[in-house]
Amino acid sequence: MTTQNFLAEIGTEELPPKALKKLATAFAENVENELNQAGLTFEKVQWFAAPRRLAVKVLNLATSQPTKEIEKRGPAVSAAFDAEGKPTKAAEGWARGCGITVEQAERLATDKGEWLVHRATIEGQPTKNLMLDIVTRSLANLPIPKMMRWGDKTEQFVRPVHTVSLLLGGELIEGEILGIASGRTIRGHRFLGEAEFQIAHADEYPQILKDKGSVIADFNERRAIILADSQAKASALGGVADIEDDLLDEVTSLVEFPNVLTATFEERFLAVPAEALVYTMKGDQKYFPIYDKNGKLLPHFIFVSNINPTDPTPIIEGNEKVVRPRLSDAEFFFNTDKKQRLEDLLPRLETVLFQQQLGTLLDKTKRIQALAGEIATQIGADKAKAERAGLLSKCDLMTNMVFEFTDTQGVMGMHYARHDGEDEEVAVALNEQYMPRFAGDNLPNSLVASSVALADKFDTLTGIFGIGQAPKGSADPFALRRAALGALRIIVEKNLPLDLAEIVKKSTALFADRLTNQNVVDDVVDFMLGRFRAWYQDEGIAVDVIQAVLARRPTKPADFDARVRAVSHFRTLDSAEALAAANKRVSNILAKIEGEISSKIDRTLLLEPEEKALAEQVLALQSELAPLFAKGEYQPALDRLAGLREVIDNFFDKVMVNAEDEKLRQNRQAILNTLRNLFLQVADISLLQ
């Protein structure tokens, strides 16, 4: 089998930097899927992405599809011909589908009789005849939320396309993609190297682009250069570069030939909270801040240029000139905001609507204040501090700094509270109220901050569900899924003794008559328990374990988590499968009984040795496990219950549950009911697969 390397490069105008990597990897995945569907063998698919191009290179691609032998079995001979020996309609229809006549069909003898069969050899098509359509379909299936047209063309893509190159080895695959004819022209860097050049062979890519066009097409190579050079530059200044993965990817997507440089800003700006300076450096300018070894911001930053002049001074001075007004703005806002206390901004919250039916931000603030105090009391936090933090929680939204730099909400509240002389725990809570902001983010450190964070999240959940605006599909404008998961993480990971239903009831009362959904408590609790399913599945917990616990609907998250861990452990035991089956059998037996089932076992009615053994062990475990259940120590409880496997098996082997004697029957049902209730103290084990 002969192979060649294949190249597909799509030259465009500047692609969206935040989407570039996703587009490139999706392009490669789509091509790989298409090749597999076409039956074409290959070694691997490489992807390349730069601001003005997407490309894939398929290594060692077979130059043709394999030849295939097909065999299509038709109707039995007995059903293929009528009494006169003429083909039946079934036979003719089958033959027509195979592209032959009935007379051309072969016959296949089997143990079950003789059948019509069509055998054929299908020659594989040359790969060069397939790749145009494969690339076209791969591009059409890219995750592009918003397409655009350009010029007088009807074709649509994420950005205007200027060049297309499809090469199988050295052979140009002709045709059009997105209205552009495939050719050998590759465009280089806008300012460095050759503007355009010709590529003769797929093997030349991407090196020829680097050598002639001054473009590093390999996204990961550019990324590695930026990361290494940035770390080296920061180290030379005695600091450490703050390089987040998302920002690094975005910067990598903005440059074709990275040149890492450092610049400075005036030290007077360091009097402004570092978060505000960093916000504008990262968010607006795509710079990397530099910190000293103690985590203090240095008056330097790193930026990445797309050109590499002999003298970089003008570029450095240009970037310093651009960032200076933004830092000056932050300085002005900070100094202006400090002229009034946070508490003085409370009345202005009355002018901002949280939600039309739920009132203003001042209304929300008062609810948070009250609920934070309730939660603080339950978890052993300082109630007065929690209420104070709740009262001030949204005041920084009225400051100039947060109005201009929205992502500094919370953290600026902390700085302003410190300036006002507020208690440190209160000040920190103003920042930590939004934690966790995203998956994997840190949780609030103190119980006071946890109280405020939970109060804020529960207020939003209760309010929005209370007016009947639960998330639908992927739409979640109030980020309720994030709020629910964040609240669960705080309660579980800090092992807080909180009950979801109780908190939602207290939250509901604070809305007075604003809520219209009478089932708001159940709706919020069910929604939050549903978020547990996604959380545990991400952790690799089996779905049936989660379902087994959900069936009991425990509304204390820490308790829910303890049950999940216990059942997950139980599932690994040798006896788990048999006990799950036994629980299912018990459940089915009890489900058929009409009326109330007693759990009172009468020892005088125990006739068979096997039922005596089970009854005695069940009764003993009732007393033994009660303290474990009370303390939420579910794993040792299930370990003890796992020891019942043999005695349960013996019971079902030797004892007739549905005895004719009513008293015997009811007593045996009571044994099973007591047994099942012991397991149900943890979860519905019958749901384990």
From Swiss-Prot:
Q: Name one GO biological process term.
A: glycyl-tRNA aminoacylation
- Localization annotation: Cytoplasm
Report which reactions are catalysed by this protein. Answer: tRNA(Gly) + glycine + ATP = glycyl-tRNA(Gly) + AMP + diphosphate
> Could you give one GO CC term from the UniProt record?
cytosol
Q: What is its EC number?
A: 6.1.1.14
UniProt keyword annotations, A-Z: Aminoacyl-tRNA synthetase, ATP-binding, Cytoplasm, Ligase, Nucleotide-binding, Protein biosynthesis
Q: Which InterPro entries match?
A: DALR_anticod-bd, Gly-tRNA-synth_bsu, Gly-tRNA-synth_heterodimer
Specify the superkingdom: Bacteria
* Major localisation: cytoplasm
SUPFAM superfamilies for the chain: HD-domain/PDEase-like
Q: Which GO terms describe its molecular function?
A: arginine-tRNA ligase activity; ATP binding; glycine-tRNA ligase activity
Q: How does it assemble?
A: Tetramer of two alpha and two beta subunits.
- Please report which protein family the annotation says this sequence is part of: Belongs to the class-II aminoacyl-tRNA synthetase family.
The protein's name in its UniProt record: Glycine--tRNA ligase beta subunit
What is the originating organism of this protein? Mannheimia succiniciproducens (strain KCTC 0769BP / MBEL55E)
**Source gene?**
glyS
